[in-house]
């Protein structure tokens, strides 16, 4: 029996799934471009393929840099109860209170977003087209991760409540089933963020507050589905894999009041607004003369190394799921 259970677990997780999934990170950056003003669109839209493709680079980097993993999450419940007043919102204050090792152990995503915002603002100010596109693509990744409830709690894959696999279910399986056919990505336009720290921490607290619901609803619905109804076998990339069934996913997303769609829409808006804010803070430099030329030899080698290490499949530090 134990061997059979292990076999099914391997089938269920045979496709590596990352934060929001590669597919959804690409979609979030893609849709964020269309919320930008024309002065930014002139650079971002022609390079929408680059911004989408390289949205997943931070996940790939977890395979070559041990420190990368902590940039994707925050085990906020380690620091007490909602609204987690014990955590200083300022990074330097948090360092003095908890130490770098503690912060690294329990995640630094809200502070890392602010660091990446500083990098993007600098790139805009210097009119460095390669840095603008690279930093914008990667900033979008971290912002999107902060909108995932299971990235903001220690029970990040249901491992503490016998719900292993819920992480990939929420952020990959559900979006892949419904995003293209049912979800609405007409969101409006990007807005300037006057206080970045307040904005990011508000999103962090939203995710933290939703984590319990993500877990409890899955457990509740599971009581009404037999195992053969909850899961289904599908062909994927030439392999038979065990997935959550469409019927179960539909019931779950409905029970969550379409939370996954709402968090994705919020991610798109936040990514676009952060890009826009960085540009405004840099003095709104004209971007019409910037074109994204071919990658330099060193840039090409960096991306090739990322892809090579990712394909090896050995993440350093804590895995996302």
Model regions and ranges:
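Sec-dependent N-terminal signal peptides
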Residues: 6-8
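Short, linear, compositionally biased motifs with a strong N-terminal bias
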Residues: 10-11, 33
């Amino acid at each position: 029996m134990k061997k059979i259970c292990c076999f099914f677990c391997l089938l269920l997780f045979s496709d590596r799934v990352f934060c929001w999934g590669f597919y959804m990170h690409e979609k979030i950056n893609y849709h964020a471009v269309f919320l930008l003003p024309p002065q930014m669109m002139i650079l971002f839209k022609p390079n929408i393929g680059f911004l989408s493709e390289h949205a997943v680079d931070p996940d790939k980097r977890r395979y070559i840099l041990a420190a990368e993993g902590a940039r994707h999450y925050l085990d906020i419940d380690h620091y007490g109860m909602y609204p987690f007043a014990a955590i200083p919102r300022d990074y330097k204050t948090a360092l003095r209170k908890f130490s770098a090792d503690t912060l690294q152990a329990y995640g630094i995503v809200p502070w890392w977003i602010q660091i990446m915002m500083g990098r993007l603002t600098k790139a805009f100010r210097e009119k460095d087209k390669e840095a603008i596109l690279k930093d914008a693509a990667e900033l979008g990744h971290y912002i999107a991760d902060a909108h995932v409830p299971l990235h903001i709690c220690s029970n990040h894959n249901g491992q503490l409540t016998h719900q292993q696999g819920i992480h990939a279910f929420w952020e990959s399986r559900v979006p892949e089933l419904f995003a293209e056919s049912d979800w609405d990505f007409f969101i409006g336009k990007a807005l300037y963020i006057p206080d970045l720290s307040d904005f990011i921490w508000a999103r962090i607290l939203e995710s933290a507050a939703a984590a319990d619901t993500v877990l409890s609803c899955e457990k509740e619905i599971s009581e009404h589905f037999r195992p053969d109804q909850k899961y289904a076998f599908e062909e994927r990339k030439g392999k038979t894999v065990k997935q959550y069934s469409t019927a179960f996913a539909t019931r779950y997303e409905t029970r969550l009041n379409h939370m996954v769609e709402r968090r994705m829409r919020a991610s798109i808006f936040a990514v676009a607004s952060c890009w826009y804010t960085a540009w405004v803070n840099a003095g709104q430099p004209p971007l019409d003369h910037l074109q994204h030329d071919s990658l330099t030899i060193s840039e090409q080698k960096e991306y090739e190394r990322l892809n090579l290490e990712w394909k090896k499949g050995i993440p350093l530090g804590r895995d996302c799921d």
